[in-house]
């Protein structure tokens, strides 16, 4: 299981060349597991009609330097995103991350590219949330990809 965690900001946005989410964008939980994590999907539009493939297991933590127990999310729960120009921000100052499961993703899901804007001034770090990705992404090292990376074994 790999952990892709945003430690320093709550800002999420799409990679260049992909549509930006409108102001009505949100995170919708599409499945839930007993561990306290949840599968979630980013979707576009006020009704969510234009869903963008983006399913991963969500890990929620408090501000950098502190922690809290993982939170369970209800199936179908919608978490709003505030729209600021071309950047989508979560409605709190908590950091968010994505934990990949070894098991297959639920049906009708696809990889999603997520970037985190680092307030420390080191620039934008980007990771690909990809169920087929098995390599060590070393997220805190700032690896950045613009397209899916090939799987390198289990």
Swiss-Prot record:
It comes from the Eukaryota. Residues 134-154 have a biased composition (Polar residues). Residues 91-154 are annotated as: Disordered. This is Putative uncharacterized protein FLJ33307.
């Amino acid at each position: 299981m790999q952990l892709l965690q945003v430690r320093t900001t709550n800002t999420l946005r799409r990679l260049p060349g992909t549509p930006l989410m409108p102001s009505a964008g949100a995170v919708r939980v599409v499945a839930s597991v007993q561990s306290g994590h949840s599968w979630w999907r980013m979707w576009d539009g006020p009704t969510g009609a234009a869903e963008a493939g983006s399913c991963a297991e969500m890990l929620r933590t408090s501000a950098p330097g502190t922690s809290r127990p993982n939170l369970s999310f209800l199936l179908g729960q919608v978490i709003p995103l505030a729209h600021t120009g071309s950047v989508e921000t979560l409605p709190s100052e908590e950091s968010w991350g994505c934990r990949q499961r070894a098991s297959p993703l639920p049906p009708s899901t696809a990889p999603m590219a997520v970037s985190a804007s680092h307030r420390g001034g080191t620039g934008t770090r980007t990771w690909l949330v990809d169920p087929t990705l098995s390599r060590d992404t070393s997220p805190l090292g700032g690896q950045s990809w613009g397209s899916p990376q090939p799987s390198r074994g289990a």
